[in-house]
Structures are given as structure tokens and as C-alpha cells.
Amino acid sequence: MLTLEELKKNTDLINEIEWNMTPEEAVKQYLEWGNTDWGSGKYVIRSKSDYTTYFVVNCWRKPYFIYLIRRNSQEAQELAKFELPSRFEKDVCELKGVYALEEEVKAWLKQELGV
């Protein structure tokens, strides 16, 4: 699993990131009934070779971590893991759970990754 410093050097992987993907939307598109919208003009997931790459924040226990996830219709792989900066903890991890990136965290992460 990559660290933040290792991820910074992996331009191809950074370019795959879907910054607006959420954990809920990924499950909907790749695992559940939400992948049947043929008439909408949206891309429909057709096979396990289709995947999305996105970030989540895991707030179940300290230290809190940001994970880069690659999900297809069969599995979710953790590609990178690094600690959530403490300045974001209060706003992001008020409740236990796994969350999409909030805008401030997303802006910080984009700056860190040179996006």
C-alpha cells in the first residue's frame, strides 16, 4: 500500500482519481441496482474490468486515515493509506464511519498531489 509520498510520484494513478466519487456512489454503481440506467447517457458498468479510483476517510478510530480505493464489481482494493491531518479531524470525523472527502480535505489533497 502506498504512502502519501509514494502516491505523489505516481502520476498515472493520480490521473485515475475520480475526485467527486463517494463511497455510496461507488457501491451504487459497481455493486447494486444503480447500474441499470441505460437511457441516461451515463457510462454503464459492463464488466469487472471497469473500475473507479477514489478517496475515503476512515473515522472509526484514531488515528484517522485517508484511503485511496479502487473498486470494481468484485472487490475494493486499498491502494494508498495515510493519516488524516489533525486540523481536519474535528470537522471530518465528528461521527464514526467512512466518508467521502469534504471540500477542505479535497482541496488540501489536490494541492499535495499537484492536481
Each model region followed by its residue ranges:
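Short, aromatic- and cysteine-enriched interfacial helices/patches
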Residues: 1-2, 112-115
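N-terminal trafficking/processing presequences and adjacent post-cleavage segments
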Residues: 1-22
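Ubiquitous "structural anchor" signal
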Residues: 6-7, 47, 105
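Charge-rich, solvent-exposed alpha-helical interaction surfaces
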Residues: 10-16, 26-30, 78, 91, ...
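Acidic, low-complexity, intrinsically disordered interaction modules
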Residues: 21, 25-100
